[in-house]
Amino acid sequence: MIPQAYISEWYQQVPWQTMEQVEQDLVICRALVEIFSDDLLANSLALRGGTALHKLFFSPQQRYSEDIDLVQITAEPFGPLVDRIRERLAFLGEPKRSPKANDFTMYFRFESEFPPIMNLRLKVETNTREHFTVSELIKIPFEVNSQWFMGSCNLTTYKFGGIIGNQAAGIVPTQKRP
């Protein structure tokens, strides 16, 4: 999908050790620009999770990300958003879809370009129920500058404290109250 020369070029911009990680990082970055360059998606979804934390608030990134975690910030039917995400990420092919009560996940699969050929995956998971937020939404400029893809957008996300709080809530076990 991505010529090896462009993956090697991206290797100079990211701290990852394997070419598969570099390739997947470039795919994630393009996917973010594709999603948040679309007005409907940018006004209906917010980026959160480890990818938001490490791509937007730490330089250089401290942790490798394999997925995109989104939250639907508007109470509206999700079907049109799924269709639009699929359109924007058409360069990845047709996703496997996994709808659940509170989220909708799309799995895009592709093969790495450098031998040994490996199956890579991009998971785009959207929480479809948390429309209310205490943490203020913000827009953060984001760009990809590669010979394979160039683009920029303003990512809709949460302030640093909101992302950290969400990450902490995800790792603290839920205790049942008596």
Stretches found by the model and what they are:
Residues M1-W10:
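Terminal (often C-terminal) interaction modules
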Residues S8, V14-P15, M19, C29-V33, ...:
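Catalytic cores of NTP-dependent nucleotidyl/adenyl transfer enzymes across multiple folds
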Residues E20, Q24, L81:
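Hydrophobic (often cysteine-bearing) scaffold residues that line and stabilize catalytic clefts
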Residues F58-P60, P95-P99, R109-P115:
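Catalytic micro-motifs at enzyme active sites that drive phosphoryl/nucleotidyl and oxygen chemistry
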Residues Q72-M106:
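Metal-dependent nucleotidyltransferase catalytic core
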Residues F36-I68, I73:
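Active-site nucleotide-donor binding segment shared across nucleotidyl transfer reactions
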Residues A31-L41, R84, R88-L92:
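Generic non-transmembrane alpha-helical segments
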